[in-house]
A protein has these predicted regions:
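Short capping motifs at secondary-structure boundaries
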Residues: 32, 46-56, 117-118
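Short, structured beta-strand segments at or near domain termini in extracellular proteins/domains
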Residues: 239-252
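C-terminal, low-complexity/hydrophilic appendages and adjacent surface loops
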Residues: 19-22
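Low-complexity, Gly/Pro
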Residues: 1-2, 43, 114, 216, ...
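Short, solvent-exposed alpha-helical surface patches in non-cytosolic proteins
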Residues: 36-48, 106-112, 128
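Hydrophobic pocket-lining residues within nucleotide cofactor-binding pockets
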Residues: 12, 32, 39, 214
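Functional-site microenvironments in short loops/helix caps that host divalent-cation chemistry
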Residues: 6-7, 13, 17, 54, ...
C-alpha cells in the first residue's frame, strides 16, 4: 500500500522573485494526491519483477556516481552502476536497503514505473505546492533546522566523506521529519523528477527534478528548498536521482 497525502484544489503562490524560470506567481491546481514517501527500491523491484523492465543505465552502462575526494563537482561514469548497484558494484547493492529511495534511474524509467502503477509524476507546480505545505517562502521550516528535515551533505565540501547524520548517501524514506502536510524527504535524500517544461529549455532531451539530494550542501547545489528547479537529461541516471508519484484526487461519493 502506498500512503497518500491529499492536496486540495485551489490557487497557490509559487516561485520566487529572483528566479527567471520560476518567478513568483499564482497557479491554479486541481486536487491531487501525492505519495507520502519517495518511491523505494522495494517498489521499483516489484515493477521490474512484474514487467521485466530494463533501465536506461542497465542498457547503456553509463550510470553516474559521485566519488568523495575528487573535485568538488565531479561525477564519474561507472559501467556497473544501475538501480541494483546505484553507487557502483564495488560499494555493494540495494540488499538491506529496500526501504531506501530507488536511484540511478532515468526520467524515462520513472515514467515507465508510473505507467505500470497507474500513476504519474507531479508537475513542477504540483511538486512545489506540496513541498511548501501551506507555507510561503523558499523553505517550509527555519533554515537553521534543515538537517532535522533533510538528508543533505553536512561537510564544508565534497573532498571528504560525510556521515555526520549517519548517512553517506541515501537514507531510508521517512527517516527525517516531515513537512507541514506530512510529506517526507521533499528536501534532500534524492532529487525528484517532475513533469513539465521551462521557458529556458532549448532541447527536447531536457527534463527537471526538484528538492535537492544527499549530495547537496550549502556550498554546492543548494537545491534543498521549495523553489529551485534542476535540469537533467531524459536518459541520465544519477545516484542521487529518484522520484515521487501523484494521482488525481478521488471525487467524493454522494
Amino acid at each position: 500500500m502506498i500512503p497518500w497525502i491529499t492536496v486540495p484544489a485551489g490557487s497557490y503562490q509559487v516561485g520566487a522573485t529572483e528566479l527567471i524560470d520560476n518567478p513568483r506567481r499564482n497557479v491554479a491546481v486541481r486536487a491531487f494526491e501525492i505519495s507520502k514517501y519517495e518511491v523505494t527500491n522495494q517498489q521499483f523491484y516489484a515493477f521490474v519483477q512484474a514487467t521485466g523492465y530494463v533501465t536506461d543505465a542497465e542498457r547503456s552502462r553509463n550510470g553516474r556516481v559521485f566519488e568523495p575526494g575528487l573535485k568538488e563537482f565531479r561525477w564519474i561514469s561507472d559501467k556497473t552502476a544501475n538501480w541494483h548497484f546505484p553507487n557502483g558494484r564495488s560499494r555493494g547493492g540495494i540488499q538491506g536497503k529496500m526501504n531506501h529511495p530507488v536511484t540511478c534511474i532515468s526520467f524515462r524509467d520513472a515514467e515507465a514505473f508510473c505507467r505500470w502503477a497507474g500513476v504519474r509524476l507531479p508537475t513542477l507546480d504540483e511538486w512545489e505546492v506540496a513541498a511548501r505545505g501551506g507555507t510561503d517562502g523558499r523553505y517550509f521550516c527555519d533554515p537553521s533546522e534543515l538537517r532535522q528535515y533533510a538528508n543533505i551533505w553536512g561537510g564544508r565540501d565534497h573532498l571528504k566523506p560525510d556521515k555526520s547524520d549517519a548517512f553517506l548517501t541515501t537514507a531510508p524514506v521517512g527517516t527525517f521529519r516531515p513537512n507541514p502536510i506530512g510529506l517526507y524527504d521533499v528536501y534532500g535524500n534524492v532529487f525528484e523528477f517532475c513533469s513539465g517544461r521551462m521557458r529556458s529549455d532549448t532541447r527536447d532531451t531536457q527534463r527537471h527534478s526538484r528538492g535537492g539530494s544527499w549530495w547537496c550542501s550549502k556550498n554546492s547545489c543548494c537545491f534543498f528548498n521549495s523553489v529551485d528547479i534542476g535540469t537533467v537529461n531524459v536518459r541520465a541516471s544519477f545516484s542521487n536521482q529518484g522520484f515521487r508519484i501523484v494521482r488525481d484526487a478521488k471525487k467524493p461519493v454522494g
